[in-house]
Amino acid sequence: MRTLEEVQGTLQIAKVKEEDLQPVTYCLSFGDNVSSGDYCLMEVDENLCKHIESGKSLIIRGDKDEHAVLCSEDKTYDLKIADTSNLLLFVPGCKTPDQLSDIPASPQLMHTQIWGFSNCYWELRRQRPRLKKLKKLLMENPYDGPPVGMQEEAPGLKYSMEDLLERIQASKEELEAHLGNVHACEIDGFWRILDFDYEMKLLGHVTQLVDSESWSFSKVPLSVCLEELGSLEPKAMIEHCLNCYGRRHSDEDNQVMYALDEDKVCRATAQLLLQNAVKFNLSEFQEVWQQSVPEGMGTRLDQLRGLALIDRSSKPETISLLRVEDLPEDTLERFNSLFSLREKWTQDDIEPYIQDLCGEKQTTGALLTKHARSSMQNGIKVYNSRRPVAT
């Protein structure tokens, strides 16, 4: 190990004035069997640092064919290796001048060992959770109601929350939120997505009961629904349907009530009508759609944002099913898919199909500026692809 005199001699050779430096000098040496593969360094922001210091975990998720992501309890981060021009040394106990409480007046030499080294580190960048795979897994075995009589439930894969966390690249909070978005429910410890026809059957039971009892859509009593419909379907499924299409609240007698969401009911009804047709005459569709929803509810085309695409250039005007969840998750692939469907888009038409691609503090306008080219057509701004569209 070096002595203080040797360090001072080195400074003289280098023509560095000792008074220009801090009085404490660290003399570094490599420990036994130190390897660059012993440690991985990761750059974290203040929030993640507090997360780790509080004793919480960070989890790396991804199958063998996927790019790894890092997840906290509520956020997902992209993991990338960043190279550095200088070698990074891992030196526990090495203090910066502001961390030294008592700075000695005379020069002092401190010996410490290097525990590891690396010329790269993991760089984290906040990203959207990759949730498209979730619906794909759940649709392997959709739930279409309890077995009838001696009939057994059709065999198929089932996934618990732990199973899904192993397969889906998302934090637990993001995963739980998306399970609610796709109307999944937990049955016997496994998360299941309802077959859409079965889901609409449940909704039909509820809306027919509301009509027969002349209830207000904003005051649907849970207890009566369960009592009246419990002989037709499992009570848990009736309550799940109310949770999907209504808002839970209590009346003045503290009775649990639901306020049915007009937009959600009308949107689901539209999907039922559109799913078996390639294209629908728009005016005819609007008429059938209004006739199909519960009396007292009003249909509007803005209820179909991200669900259906209207072609106003055709004669007559048409409407077809185009669900945002069926489009690619990757931004470039999403734009390529959209521009292969339609060469030019107005901002109002394309916005529902790219809104979910926006990162933190990013707008759809910024996305369009980056991935599309604008022009005027008949006085209306339209967007077309900046790149050749792959077919």
Swiss-Prot record:
Keywords for the protein's UniProt record, in alphabetical order: Cell cycle, DNA replication, DNA-binding, Nucleus
Biological processes annotated in GO: DNA replication; maintenance of mitotic sister chromatid cohesion; regulation of DNA replication
Listed GO CC annotations: chromatin; chromosome, centromeric region; Ctf18 RFC-like complex
Principal location class: nucleus
MF terms in GO: DNA binding
Subcellular location: Nucleus
Transmembrane stretches, start-end: none
Superkingdom as given in the UniProt entry: Eukaryota
Complex formation: Component of the ctf18-RFC complex which consists of ctf18, ctf8, dscc1 and the RFC complex.
PANTHER family for this protein: SISTER CHROMATID COHESION PROTEIN DCC1, SISTER CHROMATID COHESION PROTEIN DCC1-RELATED
Summary of the function given for this chain in its UniProt record: Loads pcna onto primed templates regulating velocity, spacing and restart activity of replication forks. May couple DNA replication to sister chromatid cohesion.
Protein name: Sister chromatid cohesion protein DCC1
Gene behind this protein: dscc1
